[in-house]
Design a protein with these regions (language model features):
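Patatin-like phospholipase
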Residues: 1-159
Length: 159
């Protein structure tokens, strides 16, 4: 598949999955908030191994889009393990608390659903996003401002 860049004010922008989504590091270095909430739309793992050509192509797409993010999360996990709390940069990484909003609904969608711009599909995504955020807040919201609710080591285990 091939998509053209979107031009805004004379500058070309590519889909993040092809060039890397915005990095997390500026949130550590340039933001006073210690909590970062990752809204994950592509599953890291699947319950079932894809067997059809379309399911395999969809999974390849998910892996490709997740690769830059997973690499950065791996770097963050490593930096947090070795951070020198006496060093300014080390303190920034050590204080970072990662959280993740995810949805089983999104895990059931295939690649073709990403091309669906019909109003019903968009409102279903919005509604599922609200539901996922509400679930996150009910189950893990009490961690905000206190501790990470996303275990980076467990997420990256076996990657």
């Amino acid at each position: 598949q091939m998509f053209q860049a979107v031009e805004i004010d004379g500058k070309a922008y590519w889909d993040g999955g092809f060039s890397g989504n915005p990095t997390i590091s500026p949130l550590v270095r340039e933001c006073s908030a210690n909590d970062t909430i990752l809204v994950q739309i592509n599953p890291v793992k699947r319950r079932r191994t894809p067997t059809t050509a379309s399911a395999i192509a969809s999974r390849v797409n998910e892996i490709s889009f997740n690769a830059p993010l997973l690499k950065e999360l791996q770097m963050i996990a490593l930096l947090q393990q070795v951070a020198d709390l006496g060093h300014c940069e080390g303190q920034l990484w050590a204080r970072m608390r990662m959280h993740r909003i995810e949805s089983d609904y999104l895990n059931e969608l295939d690649y073709a659903s990403k091309m669906n711009a019909e109003w019903a599909a968009l409102t279903a995504l919005r509604d599922e996003g609200i539901k996922a955020a509400d679930t996150f807040l009910a189950e893990k919201g009490h961690h905000l401002g206190k501790r990470a609710s996303l275990d980076l080591s467990a997420l990256l285990e076996g990657m």
